[in-house]
């Protein structure tokens, strides 16, 4: 029996009926069995690919991508995933569409969705705006489908919003499952989700938030470390605490990278912008103050530069379990 057939039989045992016609906004919206189903399907697709078997389930159709922030890895991952399943990819560049002339989200959403099976959206730079935009877009499609404008309603995959980055975090999680020989072996493992200096730009909060929101669901000991002022959304921290309590793991915050790395099985250094600055950026965005946003960006880079000692070095890695922690980014 092939691995794919074994995985398919396992899939039949899971309670996943509610996934049909659902969207993927945040990992904490999904049940444990729904997350398990996603991992199972991913492993089946991987097995088929490795054995040079076709993974096409569509003869035609579109995967629409909308990147309202720059992307390399996620852009190519989404395009590769669509191609793997038999979908053509069409990327909507808002600056080259009628959106630039004032067309509404409601109009655009229905127009681009006529032949679409899936829509991936990234909107991550402004606190309180990214998830809202994705919801507004999909609410317009609900209306279009209800009114007979669309013959089918495509599903949404969040390619990173202001709250979560579920595709990256799920891929990270599956990698850890493989590295440690099964999801059951992750229980009790310490993962350090730490801020790290970057000279580039004020990055979104959604990666650290997605990590603590997902990895606490598997009984792991999750430690978040960052300089003062670089907090994440308190509501996501509450989710992490509840997850840890429910699964026998733990969640805590520390003030130094050294404490987070001490005895860690996995380390995840990643830069993100200060929470207060992200809120200020959103206010400037609402005013259409691009000059203010540019000035804030310079301020953020200067603030980041005050914490250049927050870096993953060989000496820092020696603090981890046997000096051999799994490094992720």
Regions found by a protein language model. Give the residues of each.
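Positively charged, low-complexity intrinsically disordered leader regions
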Residues: 2-76, 80
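Glycine-rich phosphate/diphosphate-binding loop of Rossmann-like nucleotide-binding domains
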Residues: 68-80, 177-291
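A short helix->loop->beta-strand "cap" motif at the edges of active sites that frequently abuts
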Residues: 147-154, 220, 319-328
């Amino acid at each position: 029996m092939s691995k794919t057939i074994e995985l398919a039989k396992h899939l039949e045992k899971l309670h996943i009926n509610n996934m049909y016609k659902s969207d993927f906004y945040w990992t904490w919206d999904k049940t444990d069995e729904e997350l398990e189903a996603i991992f199972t399907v991913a492993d089946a697709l991987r097995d088929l690919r490795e054995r040079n078997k076709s993974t096409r389930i569509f003869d035609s159709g579109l995967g629409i991508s909308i990147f309202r922030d720059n992307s390399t890895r996620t852009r190519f991952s989404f395009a590769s995933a669509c191609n793997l399943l038999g979908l053509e990819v069409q990327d909507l560049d808002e600056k080259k569409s009628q959106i630039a002339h004032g067309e509404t989200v409601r109009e655009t959403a229905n127009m681009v969705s006529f032949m679409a099976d899936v829509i991936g959206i990234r909107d991550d730079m402004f606190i309180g705006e990214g998830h809202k935009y994705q919801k507004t877009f999909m609410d317009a499609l609900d209306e279009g489908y209800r009114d007979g404008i669309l013959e089918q309603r495509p599903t949404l995959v969040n390619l990173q919003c202001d709250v979560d980055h579920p595709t990256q975090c799920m891929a990270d999680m599956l990698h850890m499952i493989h590295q440690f020989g099964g999801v059951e072996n992750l229980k009790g493992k310490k993962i350090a989700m730490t801020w790290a200096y970057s000279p580039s730009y004020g990055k979104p909060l959604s990666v650290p938030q997605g990590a603590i929101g997902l990895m606490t669901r598997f009984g792991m000991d999750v430690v978040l470390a960052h300089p003062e002022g670089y907090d994440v959304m308190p509501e996501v921290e509450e989710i992490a605490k509840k997850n840890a309590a429910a699964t026998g793991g733990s969640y805590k915050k520390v003030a130094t990278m050294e404490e987070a790395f001490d005895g860690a099985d996995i380390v995840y250094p990643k830069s993100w912008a200060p929470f207060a600055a992200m809120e200020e950026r959103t206010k400037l965005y609402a005013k259409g103050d691009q000059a203010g946003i540019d000035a804030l960006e310079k301020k953020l880079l200067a603030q980041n530069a005050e914490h250049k000692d927050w870096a993953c070095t060989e000496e820092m890695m020696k603090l981890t379990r046997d000096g051999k922690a799994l490094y992720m980014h």
